[in-house]
Amino acid sequence: MTVLPDSLPLQSRGPSSATLAAKLWRRSRKLAASTFALALATLYTAIRAAHAYRVATFNLPPNPTNPSPNPNHLPLNPAKAATSRPALEPPAPLEPPPTPPHPPRLRILHLSDTHFYRGREDLVGWLQWLASRAGQDYDFVAVTGDMLSSFYGDRYLAQAALRPFAQTGMPGAFVLGSHDFYENRPGNPLSYLRRTPSRGAHKAVLDPSFGRYLRAFLADSGWADLNNARTSMQVNGVLLELSGVCDPHIRRDRYVGFGPDFGPVPAGPGTATQSVVAPQSAPKPDGVIRLGLSHAPYSRVLNRFAADGADLVLCGHTHGGQVCLPGGRALVSNCDLPPSLASGVFLWPPVGAGADVALVEDVAGVGVEGSCGGVPGRGPWGVSRMFVAVSPGLGTSYFTPLRVFCPPQAYILGLS
């Protein structure tokens, strides 16, 4: 009979539980440190990306009435034209866009969503440089709101950034966004994952003193105030009819159509509206360009512009999704448009079976929010299609100062 020893030799024993625990602890610490370092590097890269300002140029062909090969999203000759970095490096010189088959009659600089707060001084310098290109690269300035995020940005940054444009004598127009009326406040980021109807601002968060410096500057700038108003002007020998609405996202919009000077039509903060209270638009004369401005690209507002023969509507608000998948594929739009339309230039109304944008509105009456399938041919009501440019904006929220696969951009749009 074999007798087993009371204990195994020391060299034949496995590692003790204490030794295993120590090894696991060391490995978990290394993994945690590596993960933390990677997260910091990613965050740093995303924050720097939010300061890499660019200009994108689009040349829009005339008469966009026929369906395009990609009718719901049409990036037309985009060209990265200028880039800057946070370290005060001089911007790269503008690269000329591809020569269009129809030379543009009018070039529009579109600025949106600067969201000025302390820490965006580099954007002020970049915009001052861009102002020096007035007359060389663009003939008209359009501002579509959300220029502010804080009292500091209102008092010290917004005027410093925009005044050089006005001092050139460049004609322009503007509408306001919700954050030109009240400061950014933290919110639930998951709420952006759903398509949202206009929500109406709570009056308790509106401060009459917020934005007063920006509004005072704009009032003295000589630019057209298109907040629920319309006007017309000659720019480079082109008769330009302008119409705009105050921010539909907080239901301040009152659509006024195109035609002789009218407005502004007042709208109280958070007042519910479906955007139609104005006189009927005048018939569109030959050779006239009709330009619409709205901070948020809600479908009911786009439908109104399309019904009145707009050639181009400029919007912001979406930040292009701000945090996107590779290739700039947005996850959210923060309005009732699909994420695929969160930035860029596209034709409206959409056509084809894949069009999932809200298009349920009675032209003669009140707009209705909702969604439906595609619409045929030239869009609802037999109207011609128009271009819509949704800017990804130049800034970010104070609470999420980063961008992922979504560079901050200003647009220059050439209209033939």
Residue ranges and their predicted role:
Residues 9-14, 19-23, 30-160:
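N-terminal active-site segment of His-dependent metallophosphoesterases
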Residues 62, 117-234:
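Core catalytic region of metal-dependent phosphoesterases/phosphodiesterases
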Residues 62-67, 77, 85-88, 94-109, ...:
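Beta-strand-turn-beta hairpins that frame and shape the catalytic cleft
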Residues 68-101, 189-197, 201, 267-281, ...:
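Intrinsically disordered, low-complexity domain-flanking/linker segments in eukaryotic proteins
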Residues 110-112, 140-146, 171-178, 226-228, ...:
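Active-site neighborhood of phospho(di)ester-bond hydrolases with catalytic His/Asp-centered motifs
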Residues 116, 147-150, 178-182, 233, ...:
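Solvent-exposed loop/turn segments at secondary-structure junctions
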Residues 194-223, 235-294, 299-303, 400-403:
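Binuclear metal-dependent hydrolase catalytic cores centered on His/Asp/Glu-rich metal-binding motifs
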Residues 297-411:
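Conserved beta-sheet core of the metallophosphoesterase superfamily
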